[in-house]
A protein has these predicted regions:
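Extracellular/periplasmic Venus flytrap/periplasmic-binding protein
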Residues: 81-85, 136-137, 145-253, 287-296
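Short, charged, surface-exposed loops that flank catalytic or proteolytic processing sites
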Residues: 65, 326-339
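Extracytoplasmic "Venus flytrap"
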Residues: 28, 32-53, 74-81, 102-103, ...
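Extracellular/periplasmic periplasmic-binding protein-like sensory domains
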Residues: 144, 246-318, 326-331, 374, ...
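Immediate post-signal peptide segment of exported/extracytoplasmic ligand-binding proteins
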Residues: 21-33, 62-68, 166-172
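Short, low-complexity disordered leader/linker segments with a strong preference
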Residues: 1-30, 92, 404, 408-411
Length: 411
């Protein structure tokens, strides 16, 4: 894996110098970040805003288009309605790029709003850079030319997760516990479909949906899981909804496995602590011990903010924008969207591709397990002494899933 991470900041700096004659050099590209800075999910939002601002600095120093990046944070309170107000505020400031990721219900509202705006306002188009909203519909039935997803969607993550689970004969009874909105529904749907195809002998012994970012005590859910006899829980929960779930599991003495998407996200490492050793798994497009430039960035981020960097899609976004703007020789969203469409470029996990068919980034995925940090895997999130150790890598061709998207490019 280390050999694949061949790109460095000095190389990118050379690229900047080589393109200094281009028209867009020195332009400031503003990105409106629309995500929660209040409520139960505020710690996640705060971490991700810092991540965007940190990498705006890094990529302003060195990107092949020679542009300056600036991130403007707007609190959406995890609300679709507030997000539409935030979008209008961004447009009023002349911002042409937006990013969001926490809550697929929010992302869906933004996709619709961006589509309508771009159709009605030629010459003032906006691009939606989706960093973390993973509902597969956004690159299938609801796909949009103006929407680009840099995370891996639920169908991709569940394809990889269940490929691993298929070989584990000790997994016999599974409980599905998810948040009651589109993301949670899709996690449950794809878990059932994949397990039925790959391991029809596995029993789904229980299924629950709970309100997003409202539950403060998951003990009743843990009691139901224990009573069901489940040896494994699959959950797409994130933020406080995962941190409080694993805390309740530790306190309630549940010793089964958890297969998650977001163990590394703010609050969950602390909630797990020494508990869950060898039993809590995460499927993601990055992990804490990737080495190379990523390790240097993580160390600098931790030193500056006393916090952990875990949203690698931020890097995908800035790397992709830099290459697309260099290719387009412009910061105009219409030209940049055309350049991003099908773009192959280098990011922290090697070559990635923004698939033309649906604007879903094709990238490797990593299955990791919560365990004690060691010399080979030294990074310890939230100073727990624990880490997410890589178990299996799924290259892009394995994690890739088909799409039903009928992409409509603008006239």
């Amino acid at each position: 894996m280390m050999k694949r991470i061949a790109w460095t900041v000095p190389l990118m700096l050379a690229a900047v110098m080589a393109t200094s004659a281009w028209a867009q050099k020195g332009e400031t590209v503003k990105i409106a970040w629309i995500d929660p800075l209040s409520g139960l999910m505020a710690p996640v939002g705060s971490n991700q805003l810092k991540s965007f601002q940190f990498f705006a600095e890094q990529y302003t120093k060195s990107n092949p288009a020679g542009v300056k990046f600036e991130v403007v944070g707007i609190d959406n309170k995890l609300s679709p309605a507030e997000s539409l107000n935030a979008l209008k505020a961004a447009m009023d400031q002349g911002i042409r790029y937006i990013t969001q990721g926490n809550g697929s219900s929010v992302a869906g509202a933004l996709i619709d709003a961006v589509n309508k705006h771009n159709e009605r306002n030629p010459g003032k188009e906006i691009i939606f850079l989706n960093h973390s909203a993973v509902d597969p519909d956004f690159t299938n039935s609801k796909c949009s030319y103006w929407h680009f997803r840099f995370d891996a969607d639920t169908s991709m993550k569940m394809e990889a997760m269940t490929t691993y689970m298929k070989e584990k004969q000790d997994i016999k009874k599974v409980y599905l516990l998810n948040q009651n909105y589109s993301h949670g529904h899709q996690v449950a749907k794809f878990a059932k479909e994949n397990l039925a195809r790959k391991r029809p002998d596995i029993q789904i012994v229980g299924e629950d949906l709970h309100p997003l970012a409202q539950v403060r005590d998951f003990a009743p859910y843990i009691a139901k899981i224990k009573a069901s006899g489940a040896d494994t829980v699959i959950t797409g929960n994130w933020g406080s909804d995962l941190a409080l779930l694993v805390k309740a599991a530790n306190e309630g003495g549940y010793n089964g496995k958890f297969f998650t998407y977001y163990t590394g996200v703010t609050g969950t490492p602390t909630a797990l602590g020494q508990g869950g050793d060898g039993r809590v798994f995460q499927i993601s497009y990055q992990h804490y011990n990737m080495g190379g430039q990523m390790q240097k960035w993580q160390a600098e981020f931790k030193k500056r903010f006393n916090d952990d960097f875990y949203t690698g899609s931020v890097i995908h976004i800035f790397a992709g924008l830099g290459d697309a703007m260099a290719k387009a020789k412009s910061t105009d969203p219409v030209k940049v969207a055309a350049a991003l469409h099908g773009l192959k470029y280098q990011s922290f996990s090697g070559e990635v591709e923004m698939r033309k068919l649906d604007h879903q980034l094709q990238q490797p995925l990593y299955l990791t397990v919560w365990t004690k940090a060691d010399k080979q895997h030294p990074y310890s999130p939230e100073n727990t002494g624990m880490t997410l150790m890589p178990v299996k890598t799924f290259e892009s061709y394995i994690s890739s899933t088909p799409t039903s998207c009928q992409m409509k490019a603008p006239a």
